[in-house]
Amino acid sequence: MRTITKIGLIIICTYNVTVAQSQQVAIELTMVFDIPYIGPINRIEKITFGPNMRHSIENSKSERFYARLFVNKSKGKIIDINSHNFWKYDIEDKEYWVVPFEKALYKQDTTETKKEDSGKKRSSWSTTIGDDDNTLEGVSRVENYDVILLGKQSKKWVTTFTSANGRRLVLEEWSVPELPQLRLADSLNRALELELGRPDSVITPLGRGFSNMMLTIENIPHELEPIPGEIIKAVIKSYGDDDDEPNFSMKLEITKLISEALELRHFLVPNNYKKVTK
């Protein structure tokens, strides 16, 4: 019986690998940031995942003139571990350049430095929730069924983190039942990141959700269960003490999710782009 079980597991694993190698998944992620003094920033990111390959295209636009000078960008990035190629390109200028593949690899020796730098750059709402000087007074959640997303009935979850100084972090998240396409994209992305040397513990799963990640922090006491399914839409709002309007907001949503047969041309720089040196 054990031999039969082992053979069955081998067959299943082989099938999953074969499917992943012959498929690609395209995701479109829309993001809107509303930042004080800068205003709304709209960003659309299209990512195509393949076996040990990833092609991301980013378009960012700002509504305010002075912010447009720095934010408005259309660019792409392709990583292909199979051929050890790393390209970046500018969509508006129709130019591309080769990046040394070593720059795509995860550098373990800079982890501590990155942690320190990220801690300095993070917003106050992400650094003070649950800190010793600003203890968390409570975590609450309400839920109800909501709109159809990606053809699935969604469920809306509103999780509120309230700190001792009156600040609130409100996470609105919409979940749907498990999506095979998103699971495949997550599997392909995880395999690529592992090949690049990134530890499994720091790879963020696709569709996991912000509140699920925050509730794993040790100094945040709660009795909430993780949100089940795939979280494909989220609105994050940060409020100051007694503020009715958020001082920061961010909206993210997976608007397209397509699984199709692998086409290698989707992981190449457009042939009408000019090669430059940077």
Give the residues covered by each predicted segment.
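Sec-dependent signal peptide recognition
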Residues: R2-I10
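Generic hydrophobic/packing signal
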Residues: K6, Y15-N16, Y145, E173
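Hydrophobic h-region of N-terminal signal peptides that target proteins for export
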Residues: I10-A20
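Extended soluble regions of mature proteins
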Residues: Q23-K278
